Amino acid sequence: MRKLLVSLLLLSGSILQCAWAQNADFVRGADVSWCTEMEAAGKRFYDAQGSETELMALMHQIGMTAVRLRVWVNPEQAYGAWSDKADVLAKARRAHAAGLEVMIDFHYSDFFADPGRQTKPAAWASYTAEQLKNAVAGHTKEVLQALKAEGIEPRWVQVGNETRPGMIFDEGKIDWSKSGAAAWAGYVALSNAGYDAVKAVLPQAQVIVHIDKGPDDNAWFFRDFKKYGGKFDMIGLSHYPESAWQNENSKTAANAQSLATQFAVPVMIVETGYACTNEALAGQVMADFMAKAKAAKGCAGVFYWEPEVYGWWKPSYYNKVGWNAYNKGAFTSQGRPAPALDAFAGDGTKVQAASANSAKDRNTYDLSGRRASSSARGILVTNGRKVIR
């Protein structure tokens, strides 16, 4: 028995070490799903010097290492044709060309899925529970296979968006009128259909189950989800700090470390943002949170949600539903990166490691330590010196 306990402890320690190793490869990302609609509306993006720059290239120049792209089933049935498979492919191609990794966020809806709405796609309205599982699997495979066919293999895939109450209502709603496995059965079945579909196409991809309220103690959710058969490789959290941002930042970072420890999987902050009305304060808030997230063992990275929004732009469907403009964009009114994105530039340690191996190293590196072309623009290290082009 003693040998068994020792073996189990060593195994759990190894698993945690693997999960915590993600900190050495801390992901700095952004969900930029609105960019194509913004561009169609005439919006353009500029670097710090005011030069117009393609958004994905600009994200890379800033220091981002990844982008997150949401997928809707048939958005034309809701409020517009953006974020369908074709739109996602177009954005993924651009991200891939810019050297960014990709996270795919399946909403399994024709519009936003979140704790307040997990609306079934119109085309699936009459499906039975079994047909819904097949639809989830089919939709997941279709999008991922299309990406893979173009040489784009997402590193992470979300099966559902902010699914604290479940997904694809009513069949996938967590039924709190029941207890135990019966309450979770519908949600677990649909989530697992997505998980299995991801693995069938991309065996190495990390599958994320994502919920909101990062500062809250969320262990109960994942404890029950796992207990009743739910599968996941990574935990995703949303974190939108408000006036008590220092305390909320600390809580979310602590929760990320706690969840990574309890479930032996890495935790990703897949959404964050702060009000853009005070750019300097937003920069301070994000710097504080990034420092705390990086220090949290098991926290794999942070994605800013729709930082490219500026000038109180809003998508056309916001007018149809009567919503105000998104107020957490991280670009200035001139379309340039604002201070909130300074924290996503990285610390330069990989650059130093890459260029310090040899005094004769004449390669050019970006601020993530990745080889860059001699014609690359932005903040770079070449011949052991930092340059701005």
Residue ranges, per PLM feature:
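Aromatic-rich peripheral "rim/lid" segments of glycoside hydrolase catalytic domains that contact
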Residues: 40, 44, 176, 277-288, ...
